[in-house]
């Protein structure tokens, strides 16, 4: 006879991220019952627990996970949802370490580009890399995130800018699921930069995206969303809208890099198209925030890029709070402006640099990060959700944000399986 539950986790403190009036959505003493990869019950009384213990294949007793002396009271670990990094560019060729040295020696962006650096240097190296090379390096990068309890990662293309390489990047991203205990959400970011072959004709490149690249990628099912870098050094509002309109024709939700370097009104346009998220948003003005409320768009903060580029304009966190706009936090892991392979460090940065609270930061890597990807089945410990869970040897969830590179989970469950 089959067991009622596949796994039961008990003797843990649970930061559920539910909105129950408790910090971090802490639950009273509760056991989590898992069946077929999902949370199917939250058991809060001894009678329920005793019954469940007799009907479960695998039992995890949290009080046995943290070593203690014989006469000491066992320390109960904290259980949180698996983390979600909702904005990365971790599939690419080469690196930009040499460019980093040049920057520190005073070289300008133009000088670096003239020497073959910058985003076009990464495009060249990515185009030259075969699929296996891209996969091998992407596995190493994604593994760093997974080691911190990340169980879902968004991965963008955008370093190919031609059809073949963009397809190769997205295929590599999807295949990470075969090698690591992680869910991958892919985003087509063809409108990331203007490739050399279009000779400064951005409109012609947008024609190419809408006529050739996006239809092929959509037909192959390689993209879960479409993104655009809408900025003075990226693409205009009109060009961005053309890509958004095309994405909608293929049933793909949109996201946007906006207001990183200027107030381009990209956030308002993204909201018009019901964007899942607007990312960066350092130059977002207060008067544009109501449009995000109306479209239920998530504001994604990327403190790694802010730090790495020595930016000074901070995102309008107070105004976002005042309007109850959900705030997510991500690494923006990329070779040029945020080579950051640590979501926990990004959470610390979001507090130190942008003044989020630790709870806001942790919700930004769980509940709100899930919303930024259009996923309503994770990011919160609740019945019906995917059993992506992490266990930590900490006294309070705030420790995960407060301590830089100080914690790794003592256990991770992906789709209910202990990995």
From Swiss-Prot:
InterPro entries: Amidohydro-rel, HutI, Metal-dep_hydrolase_composite, Metal_Hydrolase. Pathway: Amino-acid degradation; L-histidine degradation into L-glutamate; N-formimidoyl-L-glutamate from L-histidine: step 3/3. Its cofactor is Zn(2+); Fe(3+). One of its GO terms (biological process) is L-histidine catabolic process to glutamate and formate. Binds 1 zinc or iron ion per subunit. Zn(2+) binds at residues 87, 89, 257, 332. It is found in: Cytoplasm. SUPFAM superfamilies: Composite domain of metallo-dependent hydrolases (SSF51338), Metallo-dependent hydrolases (SSF51556). Keywords: Cytoplasm, Histidine metabolism, Hydrolase, Iron, Metal-binding, Zinc. It catalyses: 4-imidazolone-5-propanoate + H2O = N-formimidoyl-L-glutamate. Its main location: cytoplasm. Its EC number is 3.5.2.7. One of its GO terms (molecular function) is zinc ion binding. Belongs to the metallo-dependent hydrolases superfamily. HutI family. Catalyzes the hydrolytic cleavage of the carbon-nitrogen bond in imidazolone-5-propanoate to yield N-formimidoyl-L-glutamate. It is the third step in the universal histidine degradation pathway. This is Imidazolonepropionase. It comes from Alteromonas mediterranea (strain DSM 17117 / CIP 110805 / LMG 28347 / Deep ecotype). The gene is hutI.
